């Protein structure tokens, strides 16, 4: 059984989707990030970075519990555990990992910053600085959308012919 500690955010949703698609048994536990629950001692023992999502696999690789934090690491772990969505063939595996890291290192952070500057920054830094952030991160988000559109024009899924963890990310 896998315990999923998460909240209704893009990073949390990608792991929830992956768990559903793999069919691995799991229990979901809400971590209310608005109330700061991600900073509790309990949660930080699972996710030292104090960010959701995190999982605890009660039946880890050696039969003992293992905790995994960071959405990309969780997707890889779950794919390997389930034997699905991460190809074994080296070129296909590299492609899936490239697109996974493209998402967790680029798309997620850029979209998060665009959202922050669009919705929250004006009150903290003023309209002029907030507008700069909105322009910068929206431009980068649009560039990333174009990269994804181009890739999906070449293949049915981000990493090629088959669905992979890159598509869940």
Regions found by a protein language model. Give the residues of each.
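GST superfamily/GST-like fold recognition
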Residues: 106, 110-115, 158-169
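GST-like domain detector, emphasizing the conserved glutathione-binding G-site
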Residues: 1-135, 149
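Generic secretory/membrane-interface signal
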Residues: 35, 92, 143-144, 161
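Aromatic-acidic/polar surface patches that form glycan- and anion
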Residues: 8, 64-68, 137, 141, ...
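Hydrophobic alpha-helical bundle segments that form small-molecule/ligand-binding pockets
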Residues: 145-159
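Amphipathic alpha-helical segments that form well-ordered structural scaffolds
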Residues: 18, 140-143, 147
């Amino acid at each position: 059984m896998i315990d999923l500690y998460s909240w209704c955010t893009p990073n949390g949703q990608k792991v929830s989707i992956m768990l559903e698609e793999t069919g691995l048994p799991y229990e979901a536990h809400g971590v209310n990030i608005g109330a700061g629950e991600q900073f509790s001692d309990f949660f930080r023992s699972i996710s030292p970075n104090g960010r959701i999502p995190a999982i605890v696999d009660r039946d880890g690789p050696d039969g003992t519990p293992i905790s995994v934090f960071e959405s990309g690491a969780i997707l890889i772990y779950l794919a390997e555990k389930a034997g699905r969505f991460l190809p074994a063939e080296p070129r296909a595996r590299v492609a899936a990992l490239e697109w996974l890291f493209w998402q967790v290192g680029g798309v997620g952070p850029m979209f998060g910053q665009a959202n922050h500057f669009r919705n929250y920054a004006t009150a903290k830094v003023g309209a002029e600085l907030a507008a700069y952030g909105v322009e910068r991160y929206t431009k980068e988000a649009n560039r990333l959308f174009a990269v994804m559109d181009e890739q999906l024009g070449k293949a049915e899924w981000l990493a090629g012919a088959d669905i992979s963890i890159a598509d869940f990310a």
